[in-house]
Regions:
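Flexible, disordered linker segments and immediate boundary regions flanking tandem C2H2 zinc-finger modules
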Residues: 304-309
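Core catalytic lobe of class I
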Residues: 1-303, 314-317
Length: 318
């Protein structure tokens, strides 16, 4: 069943899994932002945020059953504002250029919700995180995805939004996490100067200092990740960048493991999994995305991929 995409409602196709994935990394449809088609079976078009959260909890309960005992869930989710729309228009996202972003009328979005005021930030990410924790997941960390190139907003009474969340959740108290695989370069590490018993920081601009016992060229990865959004020309909908989930896959799995994505979309998870010598299993509501996903897997080349050209020793030329 490895390297397979099951088309249909993930609330049904997840029940067909006959193998255990080491981890799940996914970005589900956000609440009330876009209509991807699929009518009643699509997630994100629920009448209330609470109904959306309930459906997401059901999905990730099935995901948990598909994971190994030491498995993890890496969940990218954005927030939404409550804006009452009398005509109930939302953008339509499809593969067809002729239908891209055309508004459609949906009475679901024109309902006034009790407890929400116009312009309220709903708080979807933390509503979902707490609901998953209550359902049995271990909520281990919130990671901030900082976007250096956010979508422009014509707002004058708040800041332009330039971040989303990635939540790290685990199936059990003890879980697989490869800290070494995602360590970052340390920009101000020192070396021991035994002549005067102090440390020097050559090239860092810092003054020599004492009191350190050890120093390292790397450090633990921080919880704010700056990753630029990169549109994929083959799709007319949002895709999360491969560079965003590469650290998730590296930390949460080993080569040969299965990576699960119940909302495969354009196939970012599958492309990253294969580039890192992992396998994937995914679910996708729209069968027409299959060709796009396979093309992305074939065409994707990681930014850090080392050239395969043979090196030349200068001594061989002389």
């Amino acid at each position: 069943m490895r390297d397979t995409i099951l088309f249909g409602d993930c609330r049904e196709t997840l029940k067909e899994f006959d193998e255990k994935a080491r981890m799940c990394v996914t970005s589900p449809p956000y609440y009330g932002l876009r209509d991807y088609g699929g009518e009643d079976s699509q997630i994100g078009m629920e009448q209330t945020p609470e109904e959306y959260i309930d459906e997401m909890v059901k999905v990730f309960r099935l995901v948990r059953d598909c994971l190994t005992d030491d498995g993890t869930l890496w969940l990218n989710i954005g927030d939404s504002y409550y804006n009452y729309r009398k005509d109930g228009c939302i953008p339509k996202q499809t593969f067809s250029n002729s239908r891209q972003d055309l508004p459609i009328t949906t009475p679901r979005r024109s309902n006034k919700l009790q407890g929400y005021k116009d312009k309220d930030l709903i708080g979807i990410p933390w509503m979902l995180a707490f609901a998953l924790r209550s359902d049995g997941w271990y909520l281990r960390q919130d990671i901030i995805w900082h976007k250096p190139n956010p979508m422009p907003e014509s707002v004058r009474d708040r800041c332009t939004k330039s971040h989303e969340y990635i939540f790290l959740l685990s199936k059990n108290k003890n879980y697989y996490y490869d800290n070494e695989a995602i360590k970052e370069p340390a920009k101000d590490w020192g070396t021991r100067d035994r002549t005067n018993g102090k440390y020097h920081n050559e090239g860092t601009g810092l003054q020599p200092h004492s009191g350190l016992t050890k120093s390292y060229p790397t450090k633990n990865k921080r919880s704010v990740w700056s990753v630029t959004k990169k549109p994929y020309k083959g799709a007319h909908f949002a895709t999360f960048p491969p560079e965003l989930i590469e650290p998730c896959v590296k930390a949460g799995s080993q080569e040969g493991d299965i990576i699960l994505d119940p909302f495969m979309g354009s196939g970012t998870t599958a492309t990253v999994a294969k580039s890192l010598n992992r396998d994937y299993i995914g679910c996708e509501l729209h069968e027409e995305y299959g060709t796009l996903i396979q093309k992305r897997i074939r065409d994707y080349v990681p930014l850090n991929k080392v050239s395969q050209e043979p090196s030349i020793n200068i001594l061989d030329i002389i």
